[in-house]
């Protein structure tokens, strides 16, 4: 990858936008997670209404040579329904918190989806043939009159219109007391972990009635609680290693070979705080909202409220790279605290070669950082630049003084428009960005 934009780097252009244009967006239609599968041919989104929509990539052809960044609806299904916990008198939302794909082993695709309490394994498969000529049933499924059956028929498979079916294969429930914030498929592709505020469980994909509790930070007295688990992920190559982040801005790396209960970490990553910059908001903005291993497994990336940090797994005392996402908001923390925006959980993602990273911001802005050149760019997901192949213009935020023509004032940013969820194609420069109820797909400009 050459870079993320600006100078001699390639530039990004609009490919598609999915979703309605309505000003009044229904809460159920807000996208809550975005995830490419391992090949990048499928793209899944989950929303607050418990639905999963899967998009399939359009194949390039001679007639449409530039359609590589185009995805069309492949399957839509209701993954979770709202429930009620009668023991605790609590409503359980249907909102999809996370989707994780499993590597494809055969013609079918499998993914895990979770709401606050229940994880489901879904099988997505295609059918283009159907059996006809049953002896005891008509073509529409009704039982035939036994007296009318005069000959033995051999059922045959006949072609039919392609149908994509989504069926739940496993339901993993009743293992989390608190809200699930993360699921991560292990590199053995047989197990996965799920994390809530205080515990992390290890599951086998074939076994639904039990899981192993591998982390438990719940104190004997809940009044002594000082931090919660905010995210967790398995190492991409070592199936015994995983990390989890906390609301105190720390990351713990654990090795399951050391003990069955990984309460004692193998490595502890924390950046010392500068006492001169300490404020009332310091602990809130240091809370980590996302942690992602690089594809190589050498680095991991964490996202807090104002920055993205890249850590070398061999160096625990400080990150090797720090990127400021929206430092201009530091002076606005008081008002962001009052409107609860300071608690927004932004995610982050790597490109396929680990040379660039992407994360979201407010005003439907999203940021990219090139790790090699240290260049960065701010782009906007907007319908105003949604003409096919339209180039995305870099955006700049002005913090004070005279504002240039192409700059936007920090005071005019719309904090209701926020990009929390982004995904980068695992092999190419195609990105998916969720902006409220719309899914934007962009690709690099091909010369």
From Swiss-Prot:
WD repeats lie at residues 26-65, 91-132, 175-213, 224-264, 283-321, 338-379, 414-447. SMART domains: WD40. InterPro entries: PP2A_PR55 (IPR000009), PP2A_PR55_CS (IPR018067), WD40/YVTN_repeat-like_dom_sf (IPR015943), WD40_repeat_dom_sf (IPR036322), WD40_rpt (IPR001680). Keywords: Cell cycle, Cell division, Cytoplasm, Mitosis, Repeat, WD repeat. GO terms for biological process: cell division; exit from mitosis; mitotic cell cycle; myoblast fusion; regulation of chromosome segregation. The keyword Repeat applies. Gene3D superfamilies: YVTN repeat-like/Quinoprotein amine dehydrogenase (2.130.10.10). The keyword Oxidoreductase does not apply. One of its GO terms (cellular component) is cytosol. GO terms for molecular function: enzyme-substrate adaptor activity; protein phosphatase regulator activity. It is found in: Cytoplasm. Its main location: cytoplasm. Transmembrane segments: none annotated. Substrate-recognition subunit of protein phosphatase 2A (PP2A) that plays a key role in cell cycle by controlling mitosis entry and exit. The activity of PP2A complexes containing PPP2R2D (PR55-delta) fluctuate during the cell cycle: the activity is high in interphase and low in mitosis. PANTHER family: PROTEIN PHOSPHATASE PP2A REGULATORY SUBUNIT B (PTHR11871). PP2A consists of a common heterodimeric core enzyme, composed of a 36 kDa catalytic subunit (subunit C) and a 65 kDa constant regulatory subunit (PR65 or subunit A), that associates with a variety of regulatory subunits. Belongs to the phosphatase 2A regulatory subunit B family. This is Serine/threonine-protein phosphatase 2A 55 kDa regulatory subunit B delta isoform. It comes from Danio rerio.
């Amino acid at each position: 990858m050459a870079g993320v934009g600006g100078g001699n780097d390639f530039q990004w252009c609009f490919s598609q936008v999915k979703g309605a244009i309505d000003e009044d967006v229904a809460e159920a239609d807000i996208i809550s997670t975005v995830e490419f599968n391992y090949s990048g041919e499928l793209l899944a989104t989950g929303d607050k209404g418990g639905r999963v929509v899967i998009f399939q990539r359009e194949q390039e052809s001679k007639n449409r040579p530039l359609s590589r960044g185009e995805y069309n609806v492949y399957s839509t299904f209701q993954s979770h329904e709202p429930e009620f916990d009668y023991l605790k008198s609590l409503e359980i939302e249907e909102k999809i918190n996370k989707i994780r794909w499993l590597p494809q082993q055969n013609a079918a695709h499998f993914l895990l989806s979770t709401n606050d309490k229940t994880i489901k394994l879904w099988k997505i498969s295609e059918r283009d043939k159907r059996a006809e000529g049953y002896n005891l049933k008509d073509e529409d499924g009704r039982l035939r009159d036994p007296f009318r059956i005069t000959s033995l028929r051999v059922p045959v498979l006949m072609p039919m219109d392609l149908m994509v079916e989504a069926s739940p294969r496993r339901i993993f429930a009743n293992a989390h007391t608190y809200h699930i914030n993360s699921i991560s498929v292990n590199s053995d592709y047989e197990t996965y972990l799920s994390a809530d505020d205080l515990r992390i469980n290890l599951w086998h994909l074939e076994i639904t009635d039990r899981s192993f509790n591998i982390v438990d930070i719940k104190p004997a007295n809940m009044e002594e609680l000082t931090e919660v688990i905010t995210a967790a992920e398995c190492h991409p190559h070592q199936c015994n290693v995983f990390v989890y982040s906390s609301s105190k801005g720390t990351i713990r790396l654990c090795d399951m070979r050391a003990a069955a209960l990984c309460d004692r970490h193998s490595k502890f990553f924390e950046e010392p705080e500068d006492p001169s910059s300490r404020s009332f908001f310091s602990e809130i903005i240091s809370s980590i909202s996302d942690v992602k291993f690089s594809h190589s497994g050498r680095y991991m990336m964490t996202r807090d409220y104002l920055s993205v940090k890249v850590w070398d797994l061999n160096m625990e005392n400080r990150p090797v790279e720090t990127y400021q996402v929206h430092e201009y908001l530091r002076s606005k923390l008081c008002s962001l605290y009052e409107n609860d925006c300071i608690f927004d959980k932004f995610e982050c993602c790597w490109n396929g070669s680990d040379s660039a990273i992407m994360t979201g911001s407010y005003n439907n802005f999203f940021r990219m950082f090139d790790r090699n050149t240290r260049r960065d760019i701010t782009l906007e997901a907007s319908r105003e630049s949604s003409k096919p192949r339209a180039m995305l213009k870099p955006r700049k935020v002005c913090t004070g003084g005279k504002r240039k023509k192409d700059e936007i004032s920090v005071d005019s940013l719309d904090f209701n428009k926020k990009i929390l969820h982004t995904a980068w194609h695992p092999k190419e420069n195609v990105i998916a960005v969720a902006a409220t109820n719309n899914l934007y797909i962009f690709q690099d400009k091909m010369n």
